[in-house]
Amino acid sequence: MSNMQKKTDVILIGAGIMSATLGSLLKELAPEWEIKMFEKLEGAGEESSNEWNNAGTGHSALCELNYTSEKPDGSIDIKKALKINEQFQLSRQFWSYLVNSNLIRNPQKFIMPIPHMSLVQGEKNVTFLKKRFKALSNIPLFQGMEFSDDPEKLKEWMPLIMEGRTSNEPIAATKMESGTDVNFGALTRMLFEHLQNKNVELNYKHSVENIKRMKNGLWEVKVHDMNNGKIEYHTAKFVFIGAGGGSLPLLQKTGIPESKHIGGFPVSGLFMVCNNPKVIEKHHAKVYGKAKVGAPPMSVPHLDTRYIDNKKTLLFGPFAGFSPKFLKTGSNLDLLGSVKPNNVLTMLAAGVKEMALTKYLIQQVMLSNEKRIEELREFIPNAKGEDWDVVVAGQRVQVIKDTETGGKGTLQFGTEVVSAADGSIAALLGASPGASTAVNVMLEVLEKCFPQYMEKWEEKIKHMIPSYGISLVENPKLFQEIHTSTSKTLGLSKKEAVYS
């Protein structure tokens, strides 16, 4: 078997935004390293990164209310919002570096300026939004945020949402002009095209079957070439598993101690997409509501202007669903296959703890199209069923693990890196905020897995990402400079915005 092994420095598993970002960073920091990528599907960005499989929001906590929770004393906890905003600034800087270096072109193909708004109804929620606005609006990262509870002003901001609204219930919104819509599918394809130009070997229709540690410390990756049915063995010093929902089963195959006692719970998503151009033209924003009491964070409803295939469109959702598959193109045995002796108690504990989530998912699965339209009418009172079609979005595998605070079988709602103690292998697990924070997450992979190179790489990283290692909250002048320059490079300045 050893004579069939093909050696390389780095193996990337999965052709999504995470592998694309890590590959792009490594090619700038260590251009001499040999990199190979293996993807089961026919092209890049076909699963979770695909533009139809995620919300396409440049998550920076400008409008997502689940990133600012209310404390027991009634004050607003903004720590998570600041963290997510800072992380998105890192992504903007790296993308700008790639554009300025002519490594990728035409940023309008993957990022567009779009106002981000939060919308709430009811006195209690209006009070919450007002407090949130006060807590954030003085912070440089949220400069320019506007608040209004005046129905006339709200008609200017969101005419489609206010049209035909007869309720006397208090209503309020905040607005940030500096929001973005990101086509992560287009960006992923651009990055892999760039990596191909940098001699990264891209292998599509190649399914990774196994990953095991060899006696010499290298990792052996068993690959099924679906083009000809042959089995190949590739070895590398470092392996990154960026396979979306497929990451957990592959991580389990490595046998590393860090892969134990982790489970995954798949949640599928549906969106409603508008097919009426007249309705689409009446809305120009990403408007996020507030999750209903008892509903999980991934259930926050939003009405989004999106740019897909250079065309303006309008989506509403998400509606959650349940499928045992870990990937949209996965198997119905994925969930069952992920239950191992080392995580069965963790999974069972989560099952007992998360009865509310289970109930919510069952209710969502049972929703008829008419019921979905009723939920849509909370946003668009005049919505007509014939103007909207249902599209199935991607699968998200929420991480289940034992934590000190939550105890056994705690469901996680973030994105996290799991790596071997020696840094030779890393996997990305979890969901939101996901793709928006890809650069921050991949910098974390570099720090965890290549600590011996970080001193050497630091100067180059800071050249690409000027705020690396610096808090923008504490350096408002630097934030202003970075925000202005990235807006200009990415075509996000108001005067430069071009809409299709």
UniProtKB/Swiss-Prot annotation:
Domain of life: Bacteria
An example molecular function term from Gene Ontology annotations: 2-hydroxyglutarate dehydrogenase activity
BP GO annotations: tricarboxylic acid cycle
Cofactor: FAD
InterPro entries to which the protein is assigned, alphabetical: FAD/NAD-bd_sf (IPR036188), MQO (IPR006231)
Protein's pathway: Carbohydrate metabolism; tricarboxylic acid cycle; oxaloacetate from (S)-malate (quinone route): step 1/1
Enzyme Commission designation: 1.1.5.4
Pfam families: Mqo
Family the entry assigns: Belongs to the MQO family.
NCBIfam families (UniProt xref): mal_quin_oxido (TIGR01320), PRK05257.1-1 (NF003603), PRK05257.1-3 (NF003604), PRK05257.1-4 (NF003605), PRK05257.2-1 (NF003606), PRK05257.2-4 (NF003608), PRK05257.3-1 (NF003610), PRK05257.3-2 (NF003611)
HAMAP family in alphabetical order: MQO (MF_00212)
Protein name, as recorded: Probable malate:quinone oxidoreductase
Gene: mqo
